[in-house]
Amino acid sequence: MDKFSELGSIAWLWTNSELHQNWPLSLFSTNVIPAIETQQYVLLVRDGMPIAYCSWARLNLETEVKYINDVTSLKLEDWQSGDRYWFIDWIAPFGDSYLLTKHMRKLFSDGLFRAIRVDAGSPNGKISEFYGRNVDAKLAMQSFEQYQKELMNALSQQDNFIISTSK
C-alpha cells in the first residue's frame, strides 16, 4: 500500500473512532503524517479493510516535556529525537484493540512505552505505561519510576508547574 492509501485508511479509522472523530484535521496532520514519514506506525488490515492503527515516537526528555505540556507540539524531527518511547495514537474502533495489543507486544517485545490516554468526551488525559512481553514486570516498574522522576524534575523547572500532593 502506498503512503496516500495508508493515509486514507488511517483517516477512515479516525472517523470511526469515538475519541478521534471530532478532533481537528490539524491534529490528524500533526499525529499521522510524521508517523508515516518516519515509518513509526502499524496499520492492521483484515480482508482489505483497515481495523486498527498505532503510531509511536521516540522522544528525548526535552521533547517529552514539550509533548506533556502540549500534545500538538511534536514536529517531524521530534519523532526520532531520543529513546523514550510514546504511543501517539492507538485506534481500534471495531473492537480489535486486543489484536493490536498482541501485535505491539510482539513487535516491541523488549520495549517500554508510555502514552497519554484520554477518554472520549474528557478534556483530561493521564499517562499510562506499557511494556513488551519479554520485559520483567518488576524491572519495567523500576524503569518507569526512573522515567517519572526525570520527567517530574524537568517539569518542575518550568515556571507554570505546580506539584500538588494528596494527604
Curated annotation (Swiss-Prot):
- The catalytic site is made up of H20, D89
User: Which keywords does this chain's UniProt record carry?
Assistant: Acyltransferase, Cytoplasm, Transferase, Virulence
Q: Which GO terms describe its biological process?
A: toxin metabolic process
A GO cellular component annotation in the UniProt record: cytoplasm
The cellular location(s) given in this protein's UniProt record come to: Cytoplasm
Q: Which reaction does it catalyse?
A: tetradecanoyl-[ACP] + L-lysyl-[protein] = N(6)-tetradecanoyl-L-lysyl-[protein] + holo-[ACP] + H(+)
Q: Note the Pfam families from the entry.
A: HlyC
| Task of the protein | Protein-lysine myristoyltransferase that catalyzes myristoylation of the protoxin (RtxA) at two internal lysine residues, thereby converting it to the active toxin.
In the record, the note on similarity to other proteins reads: Belongs to the RTX toxin acyltransferase family.
Name recorded for this polypeptide: Protein-lysine myristoyltransferase RtxC
**Organism name:** Kingella kingae
